[in-house]
Amino acid sequence: MAHFLALSQAATKSPFPKGVQSLFWFFFLNFLSCQIIMDSPIFLYAESLGASATIMGLIAGMTPLMVIFQIPAAAHVGRWGYKFFISTGWTVRLLFVLGLVFVPLMDGVLNPQSQLALVLVLLFAFNMVRGIASCAWFPWIRGLIPENIRGRY
């Protein structure tokens, strides 16, 4: 109990380390991109392309299913470093988001079924990279945020 109180008091007095404020912007932008890629807009777009209920279920299930790739990736994350794993994973992930941005622009070039197939491939790749890179997320954040201010952060 005394340790908890000491941490609580230290959390109210300790300033954030230099650079940690930038994480708030990262979290905000990450939240926005995830809302677009893994929430209502992608489902509405897939439905407009003629996606069946099965395809919609596949899209909904990709995110939790691809987290399974954390298991084999965990063996390599310590060797390459948490920051490298996260920054590389998030950068590659953004390439697939960029690909998704261009799919609606191909309306006259590709038929709706091909656009839907392209959306599925890009979402699969996005979620697989996200699943692999996310195994380094908590260790990296734990290393960035000192223990005495974690509750405040």
Model-derived features: where do they sit?
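Helix-loop boundary and gating motifs at the non-cytosolic
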Residues: 2-70, 74-77, 86-87, 93-101
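Hydrophobic core of transmembrane alpha-helices in multi-pass small-molecule transporters
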Residues: 28, 96, 111-133
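Interfacial helix-capping/hinge residues at the ends of transmembrane alpha-helices
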Residues: 42-43, 138, 151
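Helix-to-coil boundary motifs at intracellular loop junctions of multi-pass secondary transporters
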Residues: 48-49, 79-80, 140-144
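Membrane-interface helix caps of multi-pass small-molecule transporters
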Residues: 75-80, 152
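Intracellular juxtamembrane helix-capping segments at the cytosolic ends
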Residues: 130-145
